[in-house]
Amino acid sequence: MTVLAVAALSARVLAEAASEEGFDVVALDVFGDADTRRACSQWLSIAEPGGLQLDAAHLLSALEMLARRGDVAGWIAGSGFDGRPDLLERGAALLPLIGTSADALRRVRDPEAFFGFLAAEGIPHPPVQMTAPADGAGWLVKDAHGCGGWHIRRVPLQGHGDPPEVAAPVPAHHYFQREMRGEPMSATFIANGREARVLGFNQILVRPFGTRPFVFCGVLGPVPLPASVAEQVGDAVGSVAAAFSLRGLGSLDFMLDGTAFGVLEVNPRPPASLALYRQRSGQAASQWAPGGVVSAHLRACVRGELPPAPAGAGDDVANPAVAGTEIVFAPRTTHLDAAAAARLAGFAACHDLPAGATRFEAGDPVCSVTASGPDAARVCALLARGRDAVHQLLETHP
């Protein structure tokens, strides 16, 4: 059995997917949730002390230990490395990294390089500039090193004669982007450094949190797109994957307004939408990636092989089933004792379960809920029901 390490802020989905495909999994993450630990033979904390971020020293120590074991094939990096190519590079020097290289991450997360490429290729995207607009109306400021939408803010508006509030130079990895009307979407893909295969298209769920208007809360799919849009977005994915040498699982985020779309960014690592394309225990082989998406990720990275094109991917017809996952955030500071954690674990639709008594600050992720159904509307309704059930448990527990 191949031993594989997966590292991320939350490694649960990667760990479960790899385990279901027959890998012996070592999981490295921040949360150490109960279901993450069940999916792996070993769990190692890489949490920043007292925080919800990756700690470089803990990560590198864990990878060095795994390298000394001698039986770990390599590691897959998930969320949490988007703005840390140097850490990715240091980790790859200790244990083989199976995925997009640190150098490729630097380039694709450089807003001038990325949006410059889109402009040169004629790939639709919202207007972008590196300095604050004179009039902030309709503009967002983003951090190219951020993830989850927590970094996105609207540019403050100025009254007549007022000095711009965002006049000071922003860090090199920040940029300003015109807000685009439409629905936030993504394309889940697998790339081999030269080309890419789109597995499907997804609807992204976002919600405002205070001054942050577009916090990522979940994703559902695959959902159908008009054939012309699916083809154009697929071409954009292929162009970006080739230009920036992307490898393995990733996603391209875009806005969709009718038949018009605009590319927002690319996530050059296994995305949250991976959960929608997994091969689950007891089910037939995944229709999107025969043998499973983690195995397909490895084949693309190591051998350059891509899965066959999924039948009907992106067609403007109903898919046989839509899956969805949503993060449930704590609405207020909450202490979940062991009894409440056990009750939460009894909810069949809940995942990313606390391993025991846990204190959550307002805005911390408590767990996730999942659902499936015949269409996106039904899945959204089921996710809302699951979210409400978790909130009710939190509100009725001191």
Each model region followed by its residue ranges:
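Peripheral (often C-terminal) accessory segments that flank ATP-dependent C-N-forming ligase machineries
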Residues: 11, 295-398
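Hydrophobic anchor at the start of a short beta-strand
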Residues: 25-26, 125-126, 174, 324
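A conserved helix-loop-beta module that forms one wall/lid of the active-site cleft
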Residues: 93-160, 173
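Glycine-rich phosphate-binding loop of ATP-grasp-fold ATP-dependent ligases
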Residues: 138-165, 181-188, 205-225, 274-275, ...
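A short catalytic or substrate-binding loop motif that flags glycine-/basic-rich loops and adjacent residues
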Residues: 145-147, 179-182, 245-248, 320, ...
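Phosphate-binding core of ATP-grasp and ATP-grasp-like enzymes
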Residues: 173, 178-222, 231-261, 267-274
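Active-site "cap" helix and flanking loop/linker of ATP-utilizing ligase/carboxylase catalytic domains
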Residues: 231-251, 268-336
